[in-house]
Amino acid sequence: MPHRLRHFVTRHEVRSGSTLQHMKSGLGGAIGIGAVGALAVTTHQPFLLAPFGASAVLLFGHPASPLAQPANVIGGYFVATLVTLLVLMLFPGAWVAAAVGVGLVIALMSILRITHPPAGAIPILAATSTIQGGTLLGVVVGGSIGLVGVASLHHWLPPRFEYPKRRPVKENGAP
């Protein structure tokens, strides 16, 4: 294989955890998405959103990541939804609203330090679907809270994992 192409096919993810932990992560993802799906069926609201699958990968497969912390997940989705609603009012064209929305969501999440990459899909989702307004805000924020809740319970079960990450405490006891 040519040297220049080798970097594209080399795995850069560090080996971590046991097979049991990986199986628990997969089960957690299935339960998390299942809970959101059950909420959708029960409430007749479109809670089962594609970006939540990507959130589940982070929440259950990489819970130590800053991108998987509750403030990032819930805050990122909240900011993304508010930006999306504003952009859809200002730009009637779906592709323009999606493009401007994604750009603004990236910038605002970065500025606020609540980056959650799956939330970047919300402007595209809203620009290409019939989910709008209060329904969009409710299902996105409600679904993200549900996923974080399931992840919190999931990581409490053995083999346990500290989630959410705790802020380090300094020697004098101050955070």
Residue ranges and their predicted role:
Residues M1-F78, L82-L86, L90-A99, S129-P175:
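Alpha-helical transmembrane segments and their membrane-interface boundaries
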Residues G53-A54, V105, A121:
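Alpha-helical structural signal
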Residues P63-N72, M109-A119:
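Membrane-helix interface "capping/anchor" motifs
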Residues L82-V83, I111, P123-I124:
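Active-site beta-strand/loop microenvironment that shapes enzyme catalytic pockets
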Residues F91-P117:
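Internal alpha-helical transmembrane segments of multi-pass membrane proteins
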Residues I114-T115, G120-L137:
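Membrane-helix boundary connector in multi-pass membrane proteins
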